[in-house]
Regions:
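Active-site-adjacent structural elements that line small-molecule/cofactor binding pockets in enzymes
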Residues: 1-300
Length: 300
């Protein structure tokens, strides 16, 4: 799928959700259908040591009619390149091109938990793309071919996303990173960062919830802290689940307008699409927050 067509298809606002693989299928289907009904253009989700992205993508595609479903990301260590190529072709052909294959090298602790050996991520992703391009496939072919994007944080992975994929899907980033990413990608490739959001206006409460439900976990992963160091953060920001400065930079908390401003900062920095991740502090999958935000982010 041409890059401009992909950006047009998914629109300017999507949803990133980490909980859809951890609930009964019926609950995930209802959530996906409502996210589509609210008008979000894409539904992104990750892959953990306890979930599998391709089967979840099929479930979400079957539950919806228009929204693009995107792996954000599928871990390259979980399945070989031929399997990823076949899965992407199958899903894109069966669901009218609504599937986007987001790929990434994940993180050493998560790869090790699956019994694999983590290797140099840039070389590993490049070799994986080579193998995908050479992989045979005997089923019906999607036309246009399924789009693929890369989880890219550092300059060299962003260059690979520019040269070998439709674009980049950075996670756990700031608008400053989005600006740097756009500079490397250039004008054409898709840039679709994730942005965590939390509708809570009390600073102490918001930061506490953000640490509990988001930053504390990700600050244990060296790829993210390495990227944050490039953005000017240091060890003092990584302790205790994140300094106030770091939490405020990573999580857009406050009222609806505060979230709108942060999303606009990403767009102003060069993002084509921003995937908001509602921090589900109430065990309700954050759907209530998505309902409140949709009229402002999508229609506003």
């Amino acid at each position: 799928m041409p890059q401009h067509a992909l950006a047009s298809r998914i629109g300017r606002i999507g949803v990133w959700h980490g909980g859809l693989g951890q609930v009964p299928g019926a609950v995930a289907r209802r959530a996906a259908a409502e996210i589509e009904q609210l008008g979000y253009g894409a539904l992104w989700f990750g892959e953990t040591p306890a979930t599998e992205s391709m089967s979840l993508a099929g479930l979400l595609l079957a539950a919806t009619e228009r929204i693009t479903v995107a792996t954000g990301i599928a871990n390259i260590w979980v399945r070989d390149a031929s399997a990823a190529h076949a899965a992407a072709q199958t899903l894109a052909e069966a669901y009218d091109g609504r599937f986007v294959l987001g790929l990434g090298a994940s993180h050493a602790p998560l790869v090790d938990a699956r019994g694999h050996r983590y290797a140099k991520p840039l070389a590993a992703v490049r070799a994986y793309l080579d193998a995908m391009d050479a992989a045979p496939y005997e089923g019906p072919v999607a036309d246009p071919p399924p789009a693929r994007v890369l989880a890219a944080l550092g300059p060299k992975m962003l260059e690979l996303a520019r040269d070998r994929a439709a674009g980049a899907h950075p996670y756990f980033v700031t608008p400053e990173h989005t600006a740097r990413a756009r500079e490397i990608l250039g004008a054409g490739p898709l840039l679709a960062p994730e942005q965590a959001v939390l509708l809570e206006s009390d600073p102490a409460t918001a930061r506490s919830l953000a640490r509990e439900h988001h930053t504390r976990f990700y600050l244990e992963l060296p790829n993210y802290t390495g990227n944050l160091r490039r953005l000017g953060f240091g060890d003092e920001d990584f302790a205790g689940g994140g300094s106030d400065r770091l939490v405020d930079a990573i999580v857009a908390w406050g009222d609806v307008d505060a979230v709108r401003r942060r999303v606009q900062e990403h767009h102003d920095a060069g993002a084509d699409h921003v995937a908001i991740q509602p921090l589900a502090t109430d065990r309700g999958l954050g759907i209530g927050q998505l309902r409140e935000l949709a009229p402002v982010l999508i229609d506003g």
